[in-house]
């Protein structure tokens, strides 16, 4: 059996105000071509199918088209909800869709859904575990001792008995290998407690031939070659610029995984980060249709900078300043800034943008403006 592992489609997503629906359709057409050329038997969608609990109507139409194309090819679909999805809405018509070999597990109902597909070697069990919170598991298991997220997910998995030797888990969770968290991107919503109470140890998946994960937008293995995040099929953030997106092709043999291939995906428009003075960036623009994140190194803000940039790059998404010579400081996290006084936050920001601290006079002016604004 061959199946394609996908995740984090985020249909309907907008990045800096840009609607990416046509880009998403373009990449789904590529995925269908990969299904055809590799003669896959199934497609796994490991959560965050939509970008929002109430997706825009065109996103729903796009998913309908994609599932219809797969069903017409007699390719089974095994999908779970993610933290961005509405589990209840994703479950709509799930029973009817199952008649077309489209199996969707939106809500957790006390145990993962188990689907058995067959190939020439016999049955393959797909265990579908949607994104679930510890409180939801406790609701179904009130007598169990489930002190944290890890124990709750472990209990959820133990609620179903294996029905085949070859087993594939489909899940949308934050998974770590021991104390090693996955490599995050700026576009996914990840808990600040990665590696502690809001993560799941990959050791719980030892009984599965392959674990198909969603939630993290960079394709990567988690401790083992057979525990993997597929990653998002498109770049959705500045720090994903330059990363190669892919779909994961898994081949199952008689005893388990026979091979795993990473199949490159090529976007309709690349997402790029360009750095330099505004005049230089627009002097000889290249690949002008790309999505552009620009960092200007001009010593002072430039008049109508975004308008000038978009005259050269119509799809310029965002513009930031980092004057030449300014110290590049690590980005603040929510944890590092929480509780910090306004004056300290502003001074850190000013230093990062200008390469020098506030003078005494500037600090006084900022304080006065702050007090005036608070009245």
Regions found by a protein language model. Name each.
Residues 1-68, 72, 363, 368-375:
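N-terminal active-site segment of His-dependent metallophosphoesterases
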Residues 12-13, 51-53, 80-90, 110-113, ...:
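Active-site environment of divalent metal-dependent phosphoester hydrolases
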Residues 37, 42, 251-375:
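Accessory, non-catalytic peripheral segments of nucleic-acid enzymes
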Residues 112-125, 129, 227-291:
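Binuclear metal-dependent phosphoesterase catalytic core
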């Amino acid at each position: 059996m061959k199946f394609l592992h996908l995740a984090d489609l985020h249909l309907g997503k907008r990045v800096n105000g840009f609607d990416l629906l046509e880009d998403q359709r373009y990449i789904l057409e590529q995925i269908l071509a990969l299904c055809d050329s590799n003669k896959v038997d199934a497609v796994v969608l490991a959560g965050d199918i939509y970008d929002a609990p109430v997706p825009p109507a065109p996103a729903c139409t796009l998913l309908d088209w994609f599932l219809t194309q797969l069903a017409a090819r007699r390719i089974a679909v095994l999908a779970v909800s993610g933290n961005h999805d509405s589990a209840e809405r994703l479950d709509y018509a799930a029973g009817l869709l199952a008649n077309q070999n489209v199996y969707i597990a939106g809500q957790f109902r006390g145990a993962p859904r188990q689907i058995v597909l067959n190939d020439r070697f016999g049955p393959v069990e797909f265990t579908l575990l949607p994104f679930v919170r510890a409180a939801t598991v406790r609701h179904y298991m009130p007598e169990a001792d489930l002190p944290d997220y890890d124990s709750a997910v472990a209990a959820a998995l133990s609620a179903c008995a294996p029905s085949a030797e070859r087993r594939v888990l489909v899940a949308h969770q934050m998974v770590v290998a021991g104390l090693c968290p996955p490599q995050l991107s700026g576009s996914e919503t990840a808990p600040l407690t990665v590696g502690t109470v809001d993560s799941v140890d990959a050791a719980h998946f030892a009984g599965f031939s392959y674990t198909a994960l969603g939630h993290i937008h960079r394709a990567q293995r988690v401790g083992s070659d057979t525990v993997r995040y597929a990653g998002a099929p498109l770049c959705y953030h500045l720090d994903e610029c330059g990363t190669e997106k892919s779909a994961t092709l898994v081949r199952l043999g008689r005893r388990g995984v026979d091979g795993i291939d990473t199949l490159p995906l090529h976007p309709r428009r690349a997402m790029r980060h360009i750095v330099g003075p505004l005049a230089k960036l627009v002097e000889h623009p290249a690949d002008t249709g790309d999505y552009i994140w620009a960092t200007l190194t001009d010593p002072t803000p430039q008049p109508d900078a975004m308008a000038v940039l978009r005259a050269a790059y119509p799809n310029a998404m965002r513009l930031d300043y980092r004057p030449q010579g300014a110290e590049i400081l690590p980005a603040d996290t929510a944890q590092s800034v929480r509780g910090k006084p306004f004056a300290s936050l502003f001074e850190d920001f000013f230093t990062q943008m200008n390469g020098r601290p506030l003078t005494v006079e500037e600090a006084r002016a900022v304080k006065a403006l702050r007090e005036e604004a608070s009245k």
